């Protein structure tokens, strides 16, 4: 962000709207989960958007996070012993995390762009990606998730049903509720259309 000048006019307005989407309460929950999932050696960030960005910026913590969701021996991201100090190495580490998260099942619409994190352009998108990763981990329930399962929403899972041919045939003869009831109402006492009403005293 050192090379980027201040925003004015419409750009400033757009950036302001993006920054308002950042959720400080969600940040606390995500930090708790990351620390619980990766271990206390990852440390804790300073509070706020900037602290969260600096904490995750080099991609090492994110890589450890996605690796912790896999069994030993099949970790998708190689984590360097010393955090990378060169800018392109840090961006490459973040890109490896994004690829591993996508392979884990996070949809492209839930993914942030590398610059969103690296330049702090859209930290709410970073939160969305980590949130989606947590939701998937809770949904998979494969024993690798650590933390409170109530921190994330469980995604809906497919529930296939198999019907026999006889069940399908029976279903064709049932009057659906959208059609109304076939009981109670009858045409008893009604006269045909066009006939005058007969009043006999």
From Swiss-Prot:
Statement: the UniProt record of this protein carries the keyword Membrane: no
Stored InterPro entries: Calponin-like, Calponin_repeat, CH_dom, CH_dom_sf, SM22_calponin
Keywords: Acetylation, Cytoplasm, Methylation, Muscle protein, Phosphoprotein
Tissue: Smooth muscle and mesenchymal cells but not in skeletal muscle or lymphocytes.
Region (Could be involved in actin-binding) residue spans: 154-161
GO terms for biological process, alphabetical: cellular response to platelet-derived growth factor stimulus; epithelial cell differentiation
Residues of the Calponin-homology (CH) domain: 24-137
Alphabetized Gene3D superfamilies for the sequence: Calponin-like domain (1.10.418.10)
Modified residues (N-acetylalanine): 2
UniProt repeat feature Calponin-like, residue ranges: 175-200
Intracellular or extracellular location(s): Cytoplasm
Classification via Pfam families: Calponin, CH
Residue numbers of Omega-N-methylarginine PTMs: 183
Residue(s) carrying Phosphoserine: 166, 181
Function: Actin cross-linking/gelling protein.
Name of protein: Transgelin
